[in-house]
Amino acid sequence: DAKTYMRMLRVDFKSRLGKTLGIATDNYESVLLFEPPEVPKTGMIQYLKTADMSSIPLFFKPATVRLDSFEKYALKKRKAYLDDKTWYIYIFTTKKAYQRQGYGRKLMNLLLSFAKERGYRLCLETNLAANIKLYESFGFNLMDSSFYKGRLEHYVMLYGNR
């Protein structure tokens, strides 16, 4: 309904050099952030660099190099499913104490109805096989399944007709 759509907040993330939209439950028990098709997709390291977080402690440097390498891999995988009709779900999270109580489902259903009404698709990624069933329950289809460097799971899922 119109009142619910008005709760969709436009958030301008400097670190994304674009627009990210977000919705949250009243007390932020669950948060869902997503990007429209025209927003350039970057990896997490680029996100942090643009956010001017250059003072990452030295002991985190090896981890950020590994993360950057994985992000490049993930970006290549998801780009195959992104086009001018596909929104990208960047973050979907619910605080542990509020999981399995419908908070996340409420937000996801809102986004799904928005996409369906306007003829958009939605793309998301997960690194947990256990999440696949959850996303399938919303109507997402598993499009790509791979292992980064043979050990880190990576799944790309798509909602809507392609």
Predicted features by range, described:
Residues 3-23, 30, 84, 88:
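A short helix-loop-beta-strand connector motif used in the catalytic cores of GNAT acetyltransferases and
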Residues 90-99, 123-133, 148-152, 159-161:
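Conserved beta-strand-loop-alpha-helix junction that forms the acyl-donor binding cleft
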Residues 24, 33-35, 156-160:
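Short, well-ordered beta-strand micro-motif
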Residues 29-32, 144:
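A structural microfeature
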Residues 31-93:
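Conserved acyl-donor/pantetheine-binding loop and adjacent beta-alpha core of acyl/acetyltransferases
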Residues 105, 117-118, 128-145, 149:
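Conserved active-site alpha-helix within GNAT-family acetyltransferase domains
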Residues 85-87, 115-127:
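Conserved GNAT acetyl-CoA-binding A-motif
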Residues 94, 100-113:
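Conserved acetyl-CoA-binding loop-helix of GNAT-fold acetyltransferases
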